[in-house]
Each structure stands twice: as structure tokens, then as C-alpha cells.
């Protein structure tokens, strides 16, 4: 497992989330000023410098449910609200899109170019805010400084870590099905055409060398595909040509997007029940995640501006039906707990929360699990 995977996972999934929200805000004809506020608020929260500093520290990946909690908080960082079914669908679309991109990366290192494509597109979603643009550019430099010099082996380990994270997800997405890159079981179809990885040759030729390293024979073979040489290597510069198209906004053409659980995924969900035995690693993960989310500085809606609900389904009826048919094990419920405000009951939590930039000094609580959940609700 690579300790450098989390920033790439978070930024790419966050980019996909912003693509989807932008498309739905336009599809539902949300007024321009409200849509602009939502996008700017979420992007500003996502690229908060304190949060980025925590994110880029070497660390293991969080569980799917823990990471989902981060995006739930992030999606509600402004005046927009999503109900459970829409949030489930949003997360399904995000994860399947990035899984597809990781699978199709020609080289393991190209996952960095995919990330830069997301950052480039995110900057295009920012309106009238040079400060937020500067936040994204700073993260861009942080990303290239850390990952630009990694070896091919280190990127291979990152790619393997990502694929392990995604390995049990087989959710059908209408865009992928229509483009024939996903089959009815929810698995992706790998192409046998297109550019080969940069630095490699088009298959079809075998060279034989003698013991002195001199080429003595060439044999051609049919590879069964339609490959071409890569035109050039993607740039890591701020305004460079990434060449690779993976990670760009596939929702720029306005079309509805549906998700469906495959039969295999439903069967897997029905067989996989949450264990009631406490996980000994859960406390450590909660503490780490609390530190990570503590840097997000999520703003509460204030003032007279009313909030609004965004629906990721075509109609409210579809949304309600999706909530009823989704397997219980695949829903990520957020628990809200009203915890007591006793500052002396948990010295460890007091120490951790002292590192956060929280204006309300009275936000303290009792038991460890409840403390963490209450803190999440307060952010």
C-alpha cells in the first residue's frame, strides 16, 4: 500500500464531484448567483490550505465509508443540500468515473496527468474569485513538487493501491454503457486501440539479440489491435498540454446520467453485513479523519440567503424509488448526535480540537465515538 495515494484519490474524486454538481445545477436551472456561490464555496473549502497540508502528509487510505463522510461534508459546504439518495448517486458516479480513469491510464505515472486535468477543469468552474484560483494553483504546485519526481515503481504502487480501493465497485453508469466502455455486469471494457504509453513502441515486432547485444533477427506478429505511437508526453507545467484526455469533464455535453447496481454488486451487498464487533483500528481512523476534516473550515449558511435542494435524479419520484431499492449495506448514513458540552470529560479530544481553527470554544463532548461525530457535525 502506498502512503502517497490519498491526495490523488481525494483530488480526483473531488474533481468528478464538481463536474456532476455543475451539470446538475445547470440542468435544474438554479439561478446563476446561487450556482456560483455553491461552486465557489465548495472549491474554496476543498482547497483550504490547512486541509491540503493535512491531506499531503504520508498516510494510508481511509475506508470507503470514512472517505464518503468527507465528501458528504464537502458537498454541504454551501447553501445547497442533497438528500441521502442523491448523495449516494453522486458518490457512485464519482467513484466509477475515477475507477475508469485509473484502469485506462496508459502508464501508472499518468494518474498524475489525470489529476492535473481535474485541477485544470476545476479552475474553469471558479467564477470571479482570484483568491480561490490562487488556492488551486498552490495545490497544483504542491502536487507537482511531491509527485513530479516519483519513480515509475512508486507510481505503480499508487495505481495498485487505487485499484484495490475500487476493486469491489461494479455500478453501471449510463454514459459508460452508451459509450460501450462498460458492460452490463458493471465491469469496464479495456480498449485494444489508441496510443500506446509514452516511451513504448507500437506492438507487432519482436527483436532477437545475440550474446553480444547485437540485433540478429526481426519477427513481425499480428497484435489484433489498432495502436498508434503516443504523439508526445503530457506536460506537468501549470498551463501545459496534458495530452491525455482522461480526467476531463465528460458532463460538458448535457445528457442525463443514471446509475444502476449490477446483480453481482447486489448479491455481494446482501452477503456482506457490517460486523457488530468493534474494529480495533476504528478509533485510530476516526482520530486521523477528524484531524483531516478539522482543516476544512466548512462555512455554515448565514444571512438571509435561502438554501436549496439539488436532485441528482430526473424527478423526485425517481429519487424516492432509488432510496427504497438501494441495498442497506451500500448506503452511507450520516448520524447526527447531540452530545453534551463537558470540556473536562475527554482530555484527548480537547488536545486534538485545540489544533483546529474553530471559533466556538464550547464545542466539546463526552464519549470518543460520539465526540468525533459531534465534531463532524459542528464543522
From Swiss-Prot:
Keywords carried by this UniProt record: Cell membrane, Membrane, Transport
The keyword Iron appears for this protein: no
Subcellular location: Basal cell membrane
Signal sequence, renumbered to the chain: none
UniProt cross-references to Pfam families, sorted A to Z: Oscp1
Top-level taxon: Eukaryota
GO cellular component: basal plasma membrane; cytoplasm; plasma membrane
Biological function: May be involved in drug clearance in the placenta.
Designated name of the protein: Protein OSCP1
Provenance organism: Bos taurus
Gene designation: OSCP1
Amino acid at each position: 500500500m502506498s502512503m502517497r495515494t490519498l491526495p490523488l484519490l481525494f483530488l480526483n474524486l473531488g474533481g468528478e464531484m464538481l463536474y456532476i454538481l455543475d451539470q446538475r445545477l445547470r440542468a435544474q436551472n438554479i439561478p446563476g448567483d446561487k450556482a456560483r456561490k455553491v461552486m465557489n464555496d465548495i472549491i474554496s473549502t476543498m482547497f483550504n490550505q490547512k486541509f491540503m497540508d493535512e491531506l499531503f502528509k504520508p498516510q494510508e487510505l481511509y475506508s470507503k465509508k470514512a472517505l464518503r463522510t468527507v465528501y458528504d461534508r464537502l458537498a454541504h459546504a454551501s447553501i445547497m443540500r442533497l438528500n441521502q439518495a442523491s448523495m449516494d448517486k453522486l458518490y457512485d458516479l464519482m467513484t466509477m468515473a475515477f475507477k475508469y480513469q485509473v484502469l485506462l491510464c496508459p502508464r501508472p505515472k499518468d494518474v498524475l496527468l489525470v489529476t492535473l486535468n481535474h485541477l485544470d477543469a476545476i479552475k474553469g468552474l471558479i467564477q470571479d474569485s482570484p483568491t480561490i484560483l490562487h488556492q488551486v494553483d498552490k495545490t497544483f504546485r504542491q502536487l507537482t513538487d511531491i509527485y513530479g519526481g516519483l519513480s515509475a515503481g512508486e507510481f505503480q504502487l499508487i495505481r495498485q493501491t487505487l485499484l484495490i480501493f475500487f476493486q469491489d465497485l461494479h455500478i453501471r453508469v449510463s454514459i459508460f454503457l452508451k459509450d460501450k466502455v462498460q458492460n452490463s455486469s458493471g465491469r469496464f471494457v479495456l480498449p485494444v486501440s489508441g496510443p500506446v504509453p509514452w516511451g513504448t513502441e507500437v506492438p507487432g515486432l519482436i527483436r532477437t539479440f545475440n550474446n553480444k547485444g547485437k540485433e540478429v533477427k526481426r519477427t513481425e506478429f499480428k497484435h489484433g489491435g489498432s495502436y498508434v505511437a503516443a504523439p508526445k508526453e503530457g506536460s506537468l507545467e501549470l498551463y501545459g498540454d496534458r495530452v491525455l484526455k482522461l480526467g476531463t469533464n465528460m458532463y460538458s455535453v448535457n445528457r442525463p446520467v443514471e446509475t444502476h447496481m449490477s446483480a453481482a454488486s447486489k448479491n455481494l451487498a446482501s452477503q456482506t453485513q457490517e460486523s457488530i464487533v468493534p474494529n480495533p483500528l476504528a478509533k485510530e481512523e476516526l482520530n486521523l479523519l477528524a484531524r483531516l476534516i478539522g482543516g476544512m473550515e466548512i462555512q455554515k449558511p448565514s444571512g438571509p440567503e435561502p438554501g436549496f435542494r439539488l436532485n441528482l435524479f430526473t424527478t423526485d419520484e425517481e429519487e424516492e424509488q432509488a432510496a427504497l431499492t438501494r441495498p442497506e449495506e451500500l448506503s452511507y448514513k450520516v448520524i447526527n448526535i447531540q452530545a453534551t458540552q463537558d470540556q473536562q470529560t475527554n482530555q484527548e479530544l480537547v488536545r486534538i480540537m485545540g489544533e483546529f481553527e474553530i471559533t466556538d470554544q464550547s464545542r466539546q463532548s463526552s464519549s470518543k465515538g460520539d465526540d468525533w461525530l459531534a465534531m463532524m457535525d459542528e464543522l
